[in-house]
Amino acid sequence: PVVDTTGNNPLQQQEEYYV
């Protein structure tokens, strides 16, 4: 899980990587 700063929940494991 990567910490995305796109406004989504960073605590949620997502397979999409937001840069």
Swiss-Prot record:
Molecular function terms, GO-annotated: serine-type endopeptidase inhibitor activity
Top-level lineage group: Eukaryota
GO biological process: defense response to bacterium
Subcellular location, record wording: Cytoplasm
GO cellular component: cytoplasm
The keyword Ligase is assigned to this record: no
Principal location: cytoplasm
Protein keywords: Antibiotic, Antimicrobial, Cytoplasm, Protease inhibitor, Serine protease inhibitor
Keyword Cytoplasm attributed: yes
Annotated function: Serine protease inhibitor. Displays antimicrobial activity against the Gram-negative bacterium S.typhimurium ATCC 14028. Displays no hemolytic activity.
Name used for this protein in its record: Kunitz-type serine protease inhibitor 1
